[in-house]
Amino acid sequence: MLAMHCARVCSVLMGCRTTTRALSIRSFPGVTLAQIDEEVAKLLELKAHLGGDDGKHQFVLKTAKGTRDYNPKQMAIREKVFNTIVSCFKRHGAETIDTPVFELKETLTGKYGEDSKLIYDLKDQGGELLSLRYDLTVPFARYLAMNKITNIKRYHIAKVYRRDNPAMTRGRYREFYQCDFDIAGQYDAMIPDAECLKIVHEILSELDLGDFRIKVNDRRILDGMFAVCGVPDNMFRTICSTVDKLDKLPWEAVKNEMVNEKGLSEEAADQIGVYVGMQGGMDLAERLLQDQKMCQSTQACAGLTDIKLLFSYLQLFQVTDKVVFDLSLARGLDYYTGIIYEAILTQAGVAPVAPETSNEAPTEECVTVGSVAGGGRYDGLVGMFDPKGRKVPCVGVSIGIERIFSIMEQKAEASTEKIRTTEVQVMVAAAQKNLLEERLRLITELWNAGIKAELMYKKSPKLLSQLQHCEESGIPLVAILGEQELKNGVVKLRNVATRDEVDISRADLIAEIKKRTSA
């Protein structure tokens, strides 16, 4: 019965897609076309699993759940973003490493708290229990411990895997890239931490995604706050994971989880509620250092003192306008030991998306993309892998690249600007027939000189077709060969945008192309 129902729904969706879209949008004003497509895809997938109209299993050619393909335009956008990020990392003196895409399961176990359930385990093929890497931080710590490295400034860009419930319209996937920057070593307090925040500020500013905020807190402040509010020691991590949901859920829902699901007393939850509503800057840190309750925790006082120092360095880095001290920031990963931070877009210049937990239409106030960068200090992680427990202090940041890609793609779709998918500088074209050999000789000269060039794979292509290809692909120059040009020892160089043409001697052609394309 279910199979018949799903098949009927899918056939309606497939046969009347436009009408269905229109009905859905009119009936649910908060729903986007992308979300409708996502739901339709799920129904079609279910229909295929249950069987087609004849009851037989049908194979659906598709990507795995939570993954996607990228077309040339999307890859051009991604490459631009990657180049911006790598350029920033290198500007700050980082070197790069790489680690295996899968690790021993034991390497990853116990490092992520409640998020450990999202780790992908692999079937045992050779006596080792393996898991796909969940992030790039734990493999980095393992790398430091294995190689006995005590200081390094490194960046790493690679794919990670999470068995999460994907929301692909909001840039959440099961396979995605992370771009990490970390500083390992024993240094004076808060200097490396401040540089990590400076890097986040630089990258988000250069990508021009719109306005953003960087929230900072400290795990020692959180633990001290939990202690003075009456949270039992053995509940610190689980309550921290619940507080971490405040960026997605209202306080009442978070409190309900603390009290009714995790067994925290209502009094303790109410006291936590007072603190997690606080935001500010250095002034808030100074105020909390005078708070009678907070002063009872030496941990919290140490964290607050470091927050003050951090803000003094951030002032020198000229980034305090975007940074806010937010006591609700928790970051649920177990390995953080000190400063933590997270960057969110405040949506200026970003297309509205429907709220995740409401049936209301999106508004400027409720629009959110989620975190686009996050990180913190993890001084104990390397010691977990060292046989003698030797610690290497570390601090780092991870850029949430997939969400940034989603925003950049939205902006590109809304823009009239043409996206180039190749870097070809010049097209080698022929004005008459039977000039293939001459075109091949010329393009070989250009390639040997390091010029990016291409030609049409026809013996006698029409000149108009060659010029149209240049306009469609954004190729700026055309080197045109004809019988007269060959006789005179010149090449006609055409500017595709202005359509101006000039004869250039064969000997000067390479220098002229390089001069015109050097900007």
Swiss-Prot record:
<dbReference type="GO" id="GO:0004821">
    <property type="term" value="F:histidine-tRNA ligase activity"/>
</dbReference>
<dbReference type="GO" id="GO:0032543">
    <property type="term" value="P:mitochondrial translation"/>
</dbReference>
<dbReference type="InterPro" id="IPR045864">
    <property type="entry name" value="aa-tRNA-synth_II/BPL/LPL"/>
</dbReference>
<comment type="function">
    <text>Catalyzes the ATP-dependent ligation of histidine to the 3'-end of its cognate tRNA, via the formation of an aminoacyl-adenylate intermediate (His-AMP). Plays a role in axon guidance.</text>
</comment>
<dbReference type="GO" id="GO:0006427">
    <property type="term" value="P:histidyl-tRNA aminoacylation"/>
</dbReference>
<feature type="binding site">
    <location>
        <begin position="335"/>
        <end position="336"/>
    </location>
    <ligand>
        <name>L-histidine</name>
    </ligand>
</feature>
<dbReference type="Pfam" id="PF13393">
    <property type="entry name" value="tRNA-synt_His"/>
</dbReference>
<dbReference type="InterPro" id="IPR015807">
    <property type="entry name" value="His-tRNA-ligase"/>
</dbReference>
<dbReference type="Pfam" id="PF03129">
    <property type="entry name" value="HGTP_anticodon"/>
</dbReference>
<dbReference type="GO" id="GO:0003723">
    <property type="term" value="F:RNA binding"/>
</dbReference>
<dbReference type="GO" id="GO:0005739">
    <property type="term" value="C:mitochondrion"/>
</dbReference>
<dbReference type="InterPro" id="IPR004154">
    <property type="entry name" value="Anticodon-bd"/>
</dbReference>
<feature type="binding site">
    <location>
        <position position="162"/>
    </location>
    <ligand>
        <name>L-histidine</name>
    </ligand>
</feature>
<feature type="binding site">
    <location>
        <position position="331"/>
    </location>
    <ligand>
        <name>L-histidine</name>
    </ligand>
</feature>
<keyword id="KW-0547">Nucleotide-binding</keyword>
<keyword id="KW-0067">ATP-binding</keyword>
<dbReference type="InterPro" id="IPR036621">
    <property type="entry name" value="Anticodon-bd_dom_sf"/>
</dbReference>
<comment type="similarity">
    <text>Belongs to the class-II aminoacyl-tRNA synthetase family.</text>
</comment>
<keyword id="KW-0030">Aminoacyl-tRNA synthetase</keyword>
<dbReference type="GO" id="GO:0005829">
    <property type="term" value="C:cytosol"/>
</dbReference>
<keyword id="KW-0963">Cytoplasm</keyword>
<feature type="binding site">
    <location>
        <position position="178"/>
    </location>
    <ligand>
        <name>L-histidine</name>
    </ligand>
</feature>
<dbReference type="GO" id="GO:0005737">
    <property type="term" value="C:cytoplasm"/>
</dbReference>
<comment type="subunit">
    <text>Homodimer.</text>
</comment>
<keyword id="KW-0648">Protein biosynthesis</keyword>
<dbReference type="InterPro" id="IPR041715">
    <property type="entry name" value="HisRS-like_core"/>
</dbReference>
<protein>
    <recommendedName>
        <fullName>Histidine--tRNA ligase, cytoplasmic</fullName>
        <ecNumber>6.1.1.21</ecNumber>
    </recommendedName>
</protein>
<dbReference type="InterPro" id="IPR004516">
    <property type="entry name" value="HisRS/HisZ"/>
</dbReference>
<feature type="binding site">
    <location>
        <begin position="135"/>
        <end position="137"/>
    </location>
    <ligand>
        <name>L-histidine</name>
    </ligand>
</feature>
<dbReference type="InterPro" id="IPR033656">
    <property type="entry name" value="HisRS_anticodon"/>
</dbReference>
<feature type="binding site">
    <location>
        <position position="182"/>
    </location>
    <ligand>
        <name>L-histidine</name>
    </ligand>
</feature>
<dbReference type="GO" id="GO:0005524">
    <property type="term" value="F:ATP binding"/>
</dbReference>
<dbReference type="InterPro" id="IPR006195">
    <property type="entry name" value="aa-tRNA-synth_II"/>
</dbReference>
<dbReference type="GO" id="GO:0042803">
    <property type="term" value="F:protein homodimerization activity"/>
</dbReference>
<keyword id="KW-0436">Ligase</keyword>
